[in-house]
Amino acid sequence: MTMRIFPLTACMSSLPIPPSGSVFARGRTSTATTALRFCVLALALGPALASRAATPAEMKLIGDWTVEVTLKEPRAVTARLDVAPSELVTVTAEKHDALPLFNPRTGGWMKGAQLRGVRAQETTTPFLLDPDSLVLRAGPVADAETFRRGEDYEADLSWGTVGRLAKGRLKDGQPVYASYRYAPLRLDAVVLTRDAQIVLRRGEGRAAAPWPPKVDAGERPLANVWLPGRLAKLGPEHLFPILETAYPESPKPTPAPAERLLPRTMKKLRSGEPLRILAWGDSVTDGSYLSDPARERWQEQFVARLRERFPRANIELVTEAWGGRNTASYLSEPPGSPHNYREKVLGAKPDLVVSEFVNDAGLNPPQVEERYAKLLADFQGLGAEWIILTPHYVRPDWMNLTRERDVDEDPRPYVAGLRQFAARHPVALADAARRYGRLWRQGLPYSTLMLNSINHPDARGMKLFTDALMELFPDAP
């Protein structure tokens, strides 16, 4: 690995010369040479050092809802902060024009009508509904006919969906009024104010993707406190001290991965020859759920940043995406179907394929090798180069996780398989999973980036894919 070269003038003028007794000045090395070495070391480590937060705050639970926060530098400050417990929101007589038949054989968010208080993008957020609170009536008033669960209707009380039963009193097309309570998600912020006080700012409760409160100019965010819906008390897993302000980018090797693994792509980016990029994936690549897909999808951000870095680039972006499906789905589609692999993927005749398939996450390493080796052979037959994106993190229980902090290492066999495949074959790997695994160090539970509370990243999450992709390319054209 070759270190990038940085201009040293600013470093030499701003860094103090190490004292003669320091570890950097031992032996016969001259003071000037020592300072130069110190500069090179600082610049080489710069991206990683710059991402680290100033001395992180220490957090300790001293009660069910009380947190002691200590900051030792630049001046020792300690505060005891009382966190407001999860707030129950009461909904009265929410009208549903009709209920579908309850379907027990599908995902919880699809079993029936979705209660609007717990609704996320496309789905509902589980475990927000108070399961003892749900009442369905025939009218909006308290003395209206009340329906009975198990006789007239059924509900998934974890996911907040309700549907009528065929033999019950609820008829097809009959309006129903739902009353219930739920606890929204919330992210509170611990902040160091301009006058060096540690305070707690309460976040806004939302059914999905809550943001931490804004921090004013001159203030420093120290931590976030995560309230994932109904919660009896805080635990260590709810405390997110800010350890890093950004992902710690490593110094790039020379040559950059794209120069080794994507030489034809690099040549076209630099020369201005037409470059067709195919973004191939599932609903995350489709991205139609975003507020501004034309700007926020990972592939749109990627192409915009390529054009910025390579001013002569002449890029055509093609997207082929199929929500809820995976690579096997494409390979199984018959000719003439909207998502036939040979017609829609190979038929696009891309110069560069960038694939994203979180829905392939059920594959183990041998299955990855078998499936992806076939894809690689097909792409090589076209003369196309390939970047594989590792997937984002999804619902913790879908990843066999019990928390959203201390999760640097992705536990999914699929991700291990992708890394092994890329190490064995001439393909580039954009490891977005590593970036998701460190979000907790930035004070963010990764699920707060999921608009559907499951696996649909928002624009911030899309940027993590783009950051991983751009890591492959040299910084200068």
Predicted segments with their positions:
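N-terminal secretory signal peptides that target proteins for export/translocation
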Residues: 1-34
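Polybasic, proline/glycine-rich intrinsically disordered low-complexity segments
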Residues: 206-260
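Solvent-exposed loop/turn segments at secondary-structure junctions
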Residues: 283-287, 322-328, 358-364, 392-396, ...
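Bacterial N-terminal signal peptides
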Residues: 35-48
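Extended beta-strand solenoid/passenger and fiber regions
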Residues: 54-159, 166, 183-184, 189-191
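Serine-esterase "nucleophile elbow" of acetyl-processing enzymes
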Residues: 254-321, 339-349, 353
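Catalytic His-Asp segment of secreted/periplasmic serine-dependent ester chemistry enzymes
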Residues: 253-254, 258, 392-477
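Internal alpha/beta domain cores that form substrate/cofactor-binding pockets in large enzymes
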Residues: 278, 314-348, 353-355, 360-391
